[in-house]
């Protein structure tokens, strides 16, 4: 008997977390996997990771949800969520999967899980029970309560889900699939002899008013450090949370001043 599984991927982070799982499913003849892509996975501004995924994993069926890059910061999350709820729900009705797999805590995950739950499709949630201290906690916990099976990454996460009232027999701890993939991957070596360091700074969804002050203070500190130590900084682009445009605009201004 072949099971129909549907995996929802809506940003590059969830894609990287599930690569080990995608490799595993390649060798399973009893699993028919369909991958639903949406949101920033299809956005040119964020590298169109969906194209990269479809090129690397040609064995699977793909559904690309209609996507609009809404510019309004206030309405963007609401509109994208509504699109996913409607469009993913329609495809799930057609596919009739055995189980739906949802990953982590991005806002796009919640409407995807909601669509499956209200269609009485079992939901398996990956990376529940974690704590980040921002709005992601609310999304993650809401997804947990609407899911039927839980695949956590740590013993502490497992205990959190038990404390939330989830059935122990439905909670599993396979570890972090992203780490498993890193262990299998080759070591990246850089021949450049110059000194570099990496900076990653994402929007603070609970403190948008002060995030530009924090960003500018961090930029000033990094420029001073690079000047005195004769090194350069590799700065990761902020993720697709509300407030990212303000950070991006500030970064571009500073990058022009200090290439």
Residue spans of the language-model regions?
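Active-site and donor-binding regions of nucleotide-sugar-utilizing enzymes
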Residues: 4-11, 15-26, 66-167
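A nucleotide-sugar donor-handling region in carbohydrate enzymes
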Residues: 9, 41-45, 146-213
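Cofactor-binding loop segments of dinucleotide-utilizing enzymes, especially the Rossmann-like FAD-
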Residues: 10-11, 37-40, 128, 176, ...
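A short, Lys/Arg-enriched amphipathic alpha-helix followed by its capping loop at the start of a domain
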Residues: 21-31, 221-229
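Residue-level detector of structured alpha->beta connecting loops
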Residues: 30, 96, 120, 147-148, ...
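Conserved nucleotide-sugar phosphate-binding/catalytic loop shared by glycosyltransferases and other
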Residues: 32-77
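Donor-nucleotide binding loops and adjacent catalytic segments primarily
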Residues: 49-50, 190-259
């Amino acid at each position: 008997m072949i099971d129909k599984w549907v995996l929802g991927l809506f940003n590059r982070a969830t894609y990287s977390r599930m690569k080990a799982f995608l490799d595993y499913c390649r060798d399973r003849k009893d699993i028919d996997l369909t991958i639903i892509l949406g949101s920033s996975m299809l956005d040119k501004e964020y590298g169109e990771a969906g194209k990269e995924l479809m090129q690397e994993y040609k064995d699977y069926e793909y559904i690309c949800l209609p996507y609009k890059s809404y510019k309004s910061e206030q309405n963007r999350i609401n509109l994208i969520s509504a699109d996913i709820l409607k469009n993913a729900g329609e495809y799930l009705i057609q596919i009739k999967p055995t189980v739906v797999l949802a990953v982590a805590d991005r806002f796009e995950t919640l409407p995807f899980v909601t669509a499956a739950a209200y269609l009485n499709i079992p939901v398996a949630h990956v990376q529940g029970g974690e704590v980040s201290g921002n709005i992601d906690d609310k999304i993650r916990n809401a997804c947990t309560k609407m899911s039927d099976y839980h695949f956590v990454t740590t013993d502490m996460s497992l205990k959190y889900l038990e404390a939330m009232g989830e059935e122990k027999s439905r909670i599993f701890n396979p570890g972090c699939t992203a780490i498993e993939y890193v262990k299998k991957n080759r070591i990246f070596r850089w021949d450049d002899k110059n000194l570099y360091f990496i900076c990653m700074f994402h929007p603070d969804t609970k403190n948008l008013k002060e995030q530009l002050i924090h960003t500018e203070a961090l930029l000033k500190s990094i420029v001073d450090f690079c000047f005195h130590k004769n090194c350069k900084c590799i700065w990761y682009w902020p993720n697709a949370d509300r407030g990212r445009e303000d950070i991006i605009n500030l970064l571009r201004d500073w990058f022009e001043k200090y290439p």
